[in-house]
C-alpha cells in the first residue's frame, strides 16, 4: 500500500507544486449538508443498488470527507434540466453533460446565471489537490472558457496518453467469425461481406446497436464514415475549417450504405426503439454477431454468452486505400460527463470545493477508483490494487463492472486511473478493442469547445434546435426508405440551407477561430 501511495504522491508533485498550496484537513468539521443533483448512474443496478446514496463508495466519500450530502438523482438529463429550469432554489452543486444536454451548453448556463465562476484562488485554498493536478495546459485548455475563466470543476480526467479515452466502438462474436471463416474486418467492403456471411450462416440480425440512439452515435463518431471520405456525421474540423458531416455531399453515400444494410436485414428495422436489454440478448445468443457499444459492457456480456461464445474488439472501419480511420469516439482529457457546477444559489462554495477536492487526495483517489480496501480491493505484491472476489466473482451474481462502480465512484468526478481501467477491462477482447479504437486521427479533427460565443448564442440556439431535429428525422427516413436518397437528398440539403444551416456554419467557424486563437496565445 505504501509503495502505491508513494507513486500517487510522486505523480501529484510532478503535475503540480503541491507543497505551495494550502492543505485541507479531512474529515472536515461541519454540520452543513450539501445538496447535489445528478443523473443516476444506471450501472450500479448491475451491482445490486438503485440509488448511489446506498452504495459503499458514496457512503465512504461522505464519511471520510466529513461532509454529508443530500443527493437527488434523475432518470435522464432531460429531467434534470427541466428541474433546474423550474427550481425556485438551485442545489449547491449539479453534475451533467451541459454541452450536450443544456440549451446553449456551458455558455447557456452562464447566460442564464445558473452557475458561479470557479476562482483559481479559491481552488488553491479549498481544492488544492484538484488544482495541483488540473493546472496544466493539456487540461486547462479544455475547461477554460474564452473569457479566461472557469465555470465548472472537471468531470472525469484521464491520465496523459491514456488509451482508455476510446471506449466506444464495434465488437464482434469471435466464434461466429471463426465459423464463417473470416477475420475481423477493417475496410467497408470487408465489413459488408462479413455481415452478409453472418446472415447466410443463420445470424438473424448481424449488426445491432447497444441502445436506441446508437445508430446515430455510430455515425456521429465516425465508425463507418471514413470509408466514404467523411470524417463523421456531426461537427469536426479540418485544417482549421469547421464542418458538419450531415451537411456534406459525402453524407449521401453514408446514408445509402446504411439503407442497404436496412433493406437486406443486416440491421434491425427496430433500431430506433431497441433497448440495450434486447440488443444484449441478441448479441449474447448469436442472433446478432456485431454490436456498436461500450467496452465496459463486454464484462457484463461475457457472463451471458451462450456456451462456446467469445468476443473481440473491432477496427474502426475505413476504405481500402486508407491505413486507418479519420475519426472514432474518444473522450476529451477532461470529459463532459459529470462536470460539476457550483450553482448561483450556493452559499457554501468553500465546502463544495472541499467535498470535490477529497476525490483528488491520496485516500479519496483510492476510493474513487477502487472502492473500499479489504472489501472491493486489496494491495497486491506488486504494490498495486487488485480486485477481491466480491468484485470478480460476486456471490450474488452481480457483474464485475456493476460491483466495481458501486464500491468505487467511477462515474463521479475524479482521475480515471489507468490501473483501475485496466482492472475493469482485463479481457483480451477489451485490450484489443482499446488498441484498435484508438488507431484513428481523432485528435486532429475533434472540436474541443463546442459552445458558441455568447453574442451568437440566442441566434444559434433558435436555428440549431429545429435543424438538429430535422437532421435526425431525415436520417431515419432516408434509411427506412420513406425519403428517397437518390431523389430527395438534394432537397434535404436545400431545406437545411433554408433553415439557416449556412449561418450555423458561420457562427461555429467564428467560434472555432476564436478558440484556436486563444489556444495559440
Where do the protein language model's features map onto the residues?
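Extracytoplasmic/secretory soluble proteins
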Residues: 5, 9, 21-521
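N-terminal hydrophobic targeting signals that begin at the initiator methionine
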Residues: 1-2
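Hydrophobic core
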Residues: 9, 13-17
Amino acid at each position: 500500500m505504501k509503495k502505491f501511495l508513494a507513486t500517487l504522491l510522486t505523480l501529484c508533485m510532478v503535475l503540480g507544486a503541491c507543497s505551495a498550496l494550502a492543505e485541507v484537513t479531512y474529515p472536515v468539521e461541519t454540520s452543513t449538508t450539501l445538496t447535489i443533483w445528478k443523473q443516476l448512474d444506471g450501472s450500479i443496478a448491475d451491482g445490486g443498488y438503485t440509488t448511489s446514496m446506498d452504495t459503499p463508495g458514496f457512503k465512504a466519500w461522505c464519511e471520510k470527507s466529513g461532509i454529508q450530502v443530500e443527493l437527488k438523482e434523475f432518470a435522464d438529463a432531460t429531467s434534470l434540466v427541466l428541474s433546474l429550469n423550474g427550481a425556485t432554489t438551485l442545489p449547491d452543486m449539479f453534475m451533467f453533460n451541459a454541452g450536450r444536454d443544456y440549451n446553449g451548453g456551458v455558455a447557456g448556463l452562464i447566460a442564464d446565471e445558473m452557475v458561479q465562476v470557479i476562482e483559481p484562488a479559491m481552488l488553491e485554498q479549498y481544492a488544492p489537490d484538484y488544482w495541483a493536478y488540473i493546472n496544466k495546459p493539456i487540461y486547462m485548455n479544455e475547461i477554460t472558457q474564452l473569457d479566461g475563466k472557469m465555470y465548472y470543476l472537471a468531470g472525469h480526467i484521464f491520465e496523459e496518453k491514456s488509451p482508455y479515452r476510446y471506449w466506444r466502438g464495434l465488437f464482434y462474436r469471435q466464434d461466429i467469425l471463426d465459423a464463417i471463416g473470416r477475420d475481423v474486418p477493417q475496410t467497408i467492403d470487408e465489413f459488408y461481406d462479413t455481415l452478409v456471411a453472418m446472415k447466410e450462416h443463420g445470424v438473424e440480425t448481424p449488426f445491432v446497436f447497444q441502445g436506441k440512439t446508437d445508430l446515430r452515435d455510430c455515425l456521429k463518431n465516425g465508425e463507418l464514415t471514413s470509408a466514404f471520405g467523411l470524417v463523421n456525421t456531426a461537427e469536426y474540423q479540418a485544417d482549421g475549417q469547421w464542418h458538419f458531416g450531415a451537411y456534406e455531399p459525402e453524407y449521401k453515400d453514408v446514408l445509402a450504405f446504411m439503407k442497404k444494410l436496412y433493406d437486406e436485414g443486416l440491421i434491425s428495422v427496430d433500431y430506433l426503439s431497441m433497448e440495450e436489454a434486447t440488443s444484449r440478448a441478441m448479441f449474447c445468443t448469436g442472433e446478432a454477431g456485431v454490436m456498436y457499444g461500450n467496452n465496459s459492457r463486454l464484462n457484463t456480456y461475457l457472463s451471458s454468452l451462450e456456451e462456446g461464445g467469445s468476443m473481440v474488439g473491432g477496427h474502426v472501419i475505413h476504405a481500402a486505400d486508407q491505413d486507418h480511420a479519420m475519426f472514432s469516439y474518444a473522450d476529451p482529457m477532461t470529459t463532459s460527463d459529470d462536470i460539476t457546477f457550483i450553482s448561483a444559489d450556493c452559499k457554501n462554495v468553500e465546502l463544495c470545493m472541499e467535498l470535490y477536492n477529497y476525490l483528488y487526495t491520496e485516500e479519496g483517489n483510492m476510493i474513487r477508483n477502487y472502492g473500499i480496501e479489504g472489501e472491493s480491493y486489496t494491495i497486491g505484491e506488486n504494490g498495486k490494487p487488485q480486485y477481491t472476489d466480491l468484485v470478480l466473482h460476486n456471490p450474488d451474481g452481480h457483474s464485475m463492472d456493476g460491483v466495481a462502480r458501486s464500491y468505487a465512484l467511477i462515474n463521479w468526478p475524479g482521475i480515471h486511473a489507468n490501473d483501475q481501467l485496466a482492472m475493469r477491462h482485463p479481457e483480451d477482447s477489451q485490450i484489443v478493442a482499446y488498441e484498435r479504437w484508438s488507431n484513428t486521427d481523432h485528435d486532429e479533427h475533434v472540436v474541443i469547445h463546442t459552445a458558441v460565443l455568447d453574442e451568437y448564442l440566442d441566434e444559434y440556439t433558435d436555428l440549431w434546435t429545429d435543424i438538429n431535429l430535422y437532421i435526425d428525422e431525415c436520417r431515419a427516413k432516408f434509411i427506412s426508405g420513406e425519403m428517397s436518397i437518390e431523389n430527395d437528398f438534394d432537397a434535404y440539403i436545400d431545406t437545411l440551407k433554408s433553415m439557416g444551416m449556412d449561418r450555423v456554419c458561420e457562427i461555429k467557424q467564428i467560434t472555432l477561430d476564436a478558440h484556436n486563437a486563444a489556444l495559440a496565445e
